[in-house]
Amino acid sequence: MSQEIAVIGSPDFTTGFRLAGVRKFENVPDEAKDDELDEAVTRTLEDEDVGIIVMHEDDLDHLSRNARQSVERSIEPTLVTLGGSGGASGLRDQIKRAIGIDLMDE
Protein backbone atom coordinates (compact mmCIF):
# COMPACT_ATOMS: atom_id res chain seq x y z
CA MET A 1 0.00 0.00 0.00
CA SER A 2 1.34 3.39 -0.98
CA GLN A 3 1.33 6.02 1.73
CA GLU A 4 1.26 9.76 1.39
CA ILE A 5 3.08 12.73 2.84
CA ALA A 6 1.06 15.08 5.03
CA VAL A 7 2.08 18.61 5.93
CA ILE A 8 0.93 20.41 9.07
CA GLY A 9 1.51 24.09 9.69
CA SER A 10 0.69 27.63 8.73
CA PRO A 11 -0.75 28.28 5.27
CA ASP A 12 2.58 29.88 4.31
CA PHE A 13 4.39 26.65 5.25
CA THR A 14 1.99 24.23 3.57
CA THR A 15 1.49 26.13 0.30
CA GLY A 16 4.80 25.10 -1.26
CA PHE A 17 4.14 21.46 -0.49
CA ARG A 18 0.65 21.70 -1.93
CA LEU A 19 2.03 23.24 -5.12
CA ALA A 20 4.50 20.34 -5.31
CA GLY A 21 1.63 17.85 -5.22
CA VAL A 22 1.20 16.99 -1.54
CA ARG A 23 -2.52 16.38 -1.17
CA LYS A 24 -2.85 15.87 2.58
CA PHE A 25 -2.36 18.96 4.68
CA GLU A 26 -3.63 20.71 7.78
CA ASN A 27 -3.53 24.50 7.69
CA VAL A 28 -3.23 25.98 11.17
CA PRO A 29 -2.81 29.77 11.22
CA ASP A 30 -0.05 31.08 13.48
CA GLU A 31 -2.51 32.79 15.81
CA ALA A 32 -4.46 29.52 16.30
CA LYS A 33 -1.58 27.08 16.81
CA ASP A 34 -1.89 26.90 20.59
CA ASP A 35 -5.56 25.93 20.25
CA GLU A 36 -5.72 23.90 17.03
CA LEU A 37 -2.34 22.28 16.37
CA ASP A 38 -2.90 19.33 18.73
CA GLU A 39 -6.11 18.38 16.93
CA ALA A 40 -4.48 18.66 13.51
CA VAL A 41 -1.60 16.41 14.60
CA THR A 42 -3.97 13.86 16.15
CA ARG A 43 -6.11 13.70 12.99
CA THR A 44 -3.02 13.20 10.85
CA LEU A 45 -1.53 10.53 13.13
CA GLU A 46 -4.81 8.59 12.90
CA ASP A 47 -4.93 8.76 9.09
CA GLU A 48 -3.80 5.35 7.84
CA ASP A 49 -2.94 6.78 4.42
CA VAL A 50 -0.17 8.98 5.86
CA GLY A 51 3.39 7.62 6.07
CA ILE A 52 5.32 10.86 6.67
CA ILE A 53 4.30 13.99 8.54
CA VAL A 54 6.19 17.19 7.74
CA MET A 55 6.12 20.06 10.24
CA HIS A 56 8.20 23.13 10.98
CA GLU A 57 10.51 22.52 13.94
CA ASP A 58 9.23 25.63 15.74
CA ASP A 59 5.65 24.33 15.65
CA LEU A 60 6.56 21.53 18.05
CA ASP A 61 6.71 24.18 20.78
CA HIS A 62 2.97 24.80 20.33
CA LEU A 63 2.01 21.17 20.97
CA SER A 64 0.88 19.87 24.33
CA ARG A 65 3.26 17.43 26.00
CA ASN A 66 1.08 14.43 25.10
CA ALA A 67 0.70 15.42 21.44
CA ARG A 68 4.41 16.14 21.15
CA GLN A 69 5.34 12.77 22.64
CA SER A 70 2.89 10.98 20.36
CA VAL A 71 4.25 12.56 17.20
CA GLU A 72 7.91 12.23 18.23
CA ARG A 73 7.53 8.55 19.17
CA SER A 74 5.49 7.63 16.13
CA ILE A 75 7.23 5.22 13.79
CA GLU A 76 4.47 5.21 11.20
CA PRO A 77 3.79 7.88 10.28
CA THR A 78 7.28 9.26 10.76
CA LEU A 79 7.72 12.91 11.70
CA VAL A 80 10.13 15.02 9.67
CA THR A 81 10.74 18.55 10.89
CA LEU A 82 12.16 21.37 8.81
CA GLY A 83 13.62 24.72 9.77
CA GLY A 84 14.40 25.75 13.30
CA SER A 85 17.81 25.34 14.87
CA GLY A 86 18.03 21.51 14.80
CA GLY A 87 20.18 21.44 11.67
CA ALA A 88 22.09 18.30 10.83
CA SER A 89 21.89 16.89 14.35
CA GLY A 90 18.09 17.10 14.21
CA LEU A 91 18.04 15.17 10.95
CA ARG A 92 20.50 12.66 12.40
CA ASP A 93 18.19 12.10 15.38
CA GLN A 94 15.19 11.67 13.08
CA ILE A 95 16.98 9.04 10.98
CA LYS A 96 18.18 7.24 14.10
CA ARG A 97 14.65 7.19 15.52
CA ALA A 98 13.15 5.99 12.24
CA ILE A 99 15.53 3.09 11.55
CA GLY A 100 16.86 2.36 15.02
CA ILE A 101 20.59 2.84 14.39
CA ASP A 102 22.93 5.80 14.04
CA LEU A 103 24.34 5.66 10.51
CA MET A 104 26.88 8.37 11.28
CA ASP A 105 28.29 6.71 14.39
CA GLU A 106 32.03 6.19 14.08
Curated annotation (Swiss-Prot):
HAMAP family: ATP_synth_F_arch (MF_00312). InterPro entries: ATPase_V1-cplx_f_g_su, ATPase_V1-cplx_fsu_bac/arc, ATPase_V1_fsu_sf. Component of the A-type ATP synthase that produces ATP from ADP in the presence of a proton gradient across the membrane. GO terms for biological process: proton motive force-driven plasma membrane ATP synthesis. Gene3D superfamilies: ATPase, V1 complex, subunit F. GO terms for molecular function: ATP binding; proton-transporting ATP synthase activity, rotational mechanism; proton-transporting ATPase activity, rotational mechanism. Has multiple subunits with at least A(3), B(3), C, D, E, F, H, I and proteolipid K(x). Belongs to the V-ATPase F subunit family. Keywords: ATP synthesis, Cell membrane, Hydrogen ion transport, Ion transport, Membrane, Transport. The keyword Ion transport applies. NCBIfam families: PRK02228.1. This is A-type ATP synthase subunit F. It comes from Haloferax volcanii (strain ATCC 29605 / DSM 3757 / JCM 8879 / NBRC 14742 / NCIMB 2012 / VKM B-1768 / DS2) (Halobacterium volcanii).
